[in-house]
Amino acid sequence: MSKLRQIAFYGKGGIGKSTTSQNTLAALVEMGQKILIVGCDPKADSTRLILNAKAQDTVLSLAAEAGSVEDLELEDVLKIGYKGIKCVESGGPEPGVGCAGRGVITSINFLEENGAYDDVDYVSYDVLGDVVCGGFAMPIRENKAQEIYIVMSGEMMALYAANNIAKGILKYAHSGGVRLGGLICNERQTDREYDLADALAKRLNSKLVHFVPRANIVQHAELRKQTVIEYAPDSAQAGEYRTLAQKIHANSGQGTVPTPITMEELEDMLLEFGIMKTDEQALAELAAKEAKAAAALA
């Protein structure tokens, strides 16, 4: 059996990280790979499309019902989805109470101790990336995830989050084996999006693994709680996810130690690509607008 690959998808909330990861993993399982998904997002939506169901019960909620994690069996928390993909959601506490990352730590330890990682080719962690706090950084910090894929777009906050995640990877890259596998751009149809994503990837000493075009069929599939791979296997969008899966499969050992940039450098990049206006441009536009309004009144 091939060496276990532990990958993680990180990204800003709402970027389409869980959708992208589940479609990619559905394509990987079609390639004959055995997969375990460990959802590390408090929304617990990392496995919904694979299971064709509402969010599955989380390790933390089941442990609370049973008394403790020690009272659980592996089959209590592990569900089997599309083409045999194993699914677990770590979960998080009630909003405003406790550390959401605690569920990640508890879950990974429980899964390892109970043999969930046996007989799989890939373990995939789906992780919230707005905050790289101790708990959410756990797959990186504890040397679990070896390849990190950052899902982003051409929007400023997605770029900012991607750079922050790169900082988190760098922090643990030298003490462990974690590497940045690359960036995955989920198209939002912003100006010069591909160029900007590609430029950021290069600045981070990485690469743009794939540019996933925006397509309504993704939402159609999601409404039916399915991946595009399952819902419309012959569609162009399913082909995009298969291409992404092939690229990730071929990317073993290709990860890099990232070189995060400063906020000033990020803003300079946005100015360079015309995404952010300089003060001079903004003032010139305002003056032109006022002149036009004055002419209309004259």
Curated annotation (Swiss-Prot):
GO biological process entries: nitrogen fixation
Domain of life (superkingdom): Bacteria
InterPro entries cross-referenced by the UniProt entry: NifH/chlL_CS, NifH/frxC, Nitrogenase_Fe_NifH, P-loop_NTPase
Reaction catalyzed: N2 + 8 reduced [2Fe-2S]-[ferredoxin] + 16 ATP + 16 H2O = H2 + 8 oxidized [2Fe-2S]-[ferredoxin] + 2 NH4(+) + 16 ADP + 16 phosphate + 6 H(+)
Post-translational modification: The reversible ADP-ribosylation of Arg-102 inactivates the nitrogenase reductase and regulates nitrogenase activity.
Residues that, per the record, bind ATP: 11-18
Required cofactor names: [4Fe-4S] cluster
Binding site for [4Fe-4S] cluster: 99, 133
EC number: 1.18.6.1
Sequence positions bearing ADP-ribosylarginine: 102
Cofactor annotation remark: Binds 1 [4Fe-4S] cluster per dimer.
UniProt GO MF annotations: 4 iron, 4 sulfur cluster binding; ATP binding; metal ion binding; nitrogenase activity
Leading EC class: oxidoreductase
Record keywords, A-Z: 4Fe-4S, ADP-ribosylation, ATP-binding, Iron, Iron-sulfur, Metal-binding, Nitrogen fixation, Nucleotide-binding, Oxidoreductase
UniProt cross-references to PROSITE patterns, sorted A to Z: NIFH_FRXC_1, NIFH_FRXC_2, NIFH_FRXC_3
Task of the protein: The key enzymatic reactions in nitrogen fixation are catalyzed by the nitrogenase complex, which has 2 components: the iron protein and the molybdenum-iron protein.
Family that this chain belongs to: Belongs to the NifH/BchL/ChlL family.
NCBIfam families cross-referenced by the UniProt entry: nifH (TIGR01287)
Subunit-level organization: Homodimer.
Name of the protein: Nitrogenase iron protein
Organism per entry: Gluconacetobacter diazotrophicus (strain ATCC 49037 / DSM 5601 / CCUG 37298 / CIP 103539 / LMG 7603 / PAl5)
